[in-house]
Amino acid sequence: EKGEIVAFIGPNGAGKSTTIKMMTGILFPTEGNINILGLDPKKHRKKLAYEIGTVFGQKEQLWTHLTPYDNFKFFGAIYDIPNSVVEKKIKEFEELFELKDFINTPVRNLSLGQRIRCEIVASLIHEPKVLFLDEPTIGLDPVVKENVRSLIKRMNKEYKTTIFLTSHDVGDIEKLCKRVIIINNGQVVLDDSMENLKYHYLNKKIVEAKMKEKVNLDDEEGITILKDKGYNIKIEVDTEKRTVADALKLLNPDNIIDINISNIPLEDIISSIYKKEDQS
């Protein structure tokens, strides 16, 4: 749907990046058909380029010796956009993506987070109907990741741009997407709402703790022991049955030297989905 943010995920080698490359006309399918906005990426590659934007987190599209401002002007010229319109768009994005402090700094001198913001803006200059984001937050520190996610949400709300996102980061998916498509070996194994995925698969937390003194734990309802080496404990908490606070009480907070609480890795979530698919 227009304005939807869709997560397209799967394990390494599942075919995510290949699918995006076929959807954008970079690669062609050996069989079957692809339809993007009523266009065949193979037959209408040039026409489709005016309707879509792409950002590959590990590949640069900006000229590093130019400033972001000059890059944006360059991309505007490529898409035959009148200079006055490009200037207006640059001003809008400069404010929305908070580019003012570095818009006239050569791209090679920007931080990774700053460059990613500029990469996204460069892909939006021609106002695409669909934006493909392939690992947009890869390599970013947590604070910068959160900033980029916030900016993507604001952009989506402001311009109603449909976003097709691939990422191995649960945070990207959980905070940006309302729909999730999971593939493996080029096949769709799940297409569901983020709400349902959260309910079924993101209701567990991993708690890792370093203890002052050895503790002996037993599995209890909602708590599964993953590692128990006395001073180092790793447990899985089912938050539908027990709270993380309950788990910490079992460990005794006064006995904890260090602790880390995290989501189940996305790869594990995907694996559990595959197992359910196999069983069914």
Can you describe what each PLM-predicted range is?
Residues 32-42, 47-50:
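Conserved ABC transporter NBD signature motif
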Residues 65, 106-110:
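Conserved ABC ATPase signature
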Residues 127:
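Conserved catalytic motifs of ABC-family nucleotide-binding domains
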Residues 131-135:
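Catalytic Walker B motif of ABC-type/P-loop ATPase nucleotide-binding domains
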Residues 149-238:
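ABC transporter nucleotide-binding domain
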Residues 206-276:
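Short, charged/small-residue-rich alpha-helical element at the C-terminal edge
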